[in-house]
């Protein structure tokens, strides 16, 4: 809603990923919809660490967010298991998202070793990119699971496991948002 100026707002939160502001240019020449200098109440960066360069690029006093997961669940449904239970197996991690590296980094952070299968963003999976994959386990994102779950031969592949993620936010961010809300009018 930052670009919808007619929308009444009490708080503005801008979320950047770990790549920061890219080339710093606005669409269509760059990745930004608004200039980094645009006023906002809170800046959140989804990155494993906030480097001085990243902090300077996004401006303000950013809060850190990390995506994490501890378990996976079969695409076909069933019991979820800890990611650690896949250690020692031949694993491929596949991601058809805008930044597959973030998914792969999260899995490495969970202690897994695997081969990477980056797919184009919004991949439709009709070509079954897993047919020739020699792995005991194929880990996929929740976003990709939505599409894979509609394709019968993929749902039947017992190697496919979905890795749900949760956002881990800086506790100070929630406190400051609540404090800011207390000062907002309810008109």
Which residues does each PLM region occupy?
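Short, charged/polar "capping" segments at the starts of alpha-helices
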Residues: 22, 49-55, 101-102, 125-126, ...
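Redox- and metal-dependent alpha/beta enzyme cores, enriched for Fe-S-associated oxidoreductases
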Residues: 70-122, 126-127, 144, 170, ...
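Conserved beta-strand/loop subsegment of P-loop NTPase cores
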Residues: 12-15, 37-47, 59-69, 87-88, ...
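Residue-level signal for inorganic ion chemistry
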Residues: 40, 96, 138
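Generic C-terminus detector
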Residues: 130-137, 143-187
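Short hydrophobic segments within beta-strands
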Residues: 15, 93-94, 139
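Phosphate/Mg2+-binding loops and adjacent switch elements
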Residues: 1-58
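Short, conserved loop/helix-junction motifs that constitute active-site signature segments
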Residues: 7-8, 33-39, 56-58, 85-87, ...
């Amino acid at each position: 809603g930052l670009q919808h100026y007619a929308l009444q707002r009490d708080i503005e939160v801008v979320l950047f990923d770990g790549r920061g502001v890219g080339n710093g240019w606005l669409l269509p020449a760059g990745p930004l919809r608004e200039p980094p200098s645009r006023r906002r109440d809170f800046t959140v960066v989804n990155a494993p660490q906030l480097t001085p360069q990243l902090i300077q690029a996004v401006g303000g006093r950013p809060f850190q967010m990390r995506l994490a997961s501890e378990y996976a669940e079969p695409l076909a449904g069933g019991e979820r298991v800890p990611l650690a239970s896949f250690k020692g197996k031949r694993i491929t991690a596949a991601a058809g998202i805008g930044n597959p590296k973030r998914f792969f980094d999260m899995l490495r952070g969970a202690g897994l070793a695997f081969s990477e299968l980056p797919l184009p963003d919004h991949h439709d999976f009709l070509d079954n990119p897993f047919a020739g994959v020699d792995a005991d386990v194929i880990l996929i994102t929740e976003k990709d699971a939505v599409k894979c779950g509609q394709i019968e031969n993929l749902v039947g592949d017992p190697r496919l496991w979905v890795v749900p993620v949760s956002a881990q936010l800086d506790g100070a961010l929630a406190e400051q948002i609540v404090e800011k809300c207390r000062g907002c009018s309810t008109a």
